[in-house]
Amino acid sequence: MVELAKNERIDYMYSDDLKIIQDKTAFSFSLDTLLLASAAKDVIHDRYKVADLCAGNCAATIYMAYFNRAKYDAIEIQDEAASQARRSVALNNMENRI
């Protein structure tokens, strides 16, 4: 079970299939995030290695990874966002790919 900080919530995307941990007081993923990730996923093949720079809470990376078997490196330098990303990846059982 993933623990949430006092100011965090779990949001869902792509129906209820994907769960993202977000800070209630910080930037949250939006339609723009999903549109960008949707366009990117269409050119990513299963054998690719993908780097997501400034990954934030990993919403775009998790969305892209849902649609293929590529390997992803999600890179984030802000401690809180990186923590949310790690826990979101675990929540979606994608630790072996992201």
Name these PLM-found stretches.
Residues E3, D11-D46, A55-F67:
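SAM-dependent Rossmann-like transferase core, predominantly class I methyltransferases
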Residues N7-R9, D23, Y72-A74:
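N-terminal start-of-chain detector that recognizes signal peptides
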Residues M1-K6, Q84:
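Compositionally biased, low-hydrophobicity segments enriched in charged and small polar residues
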Residues S38-I98:
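Conserved SAM/SAH cofactor-binding pocket of Class I
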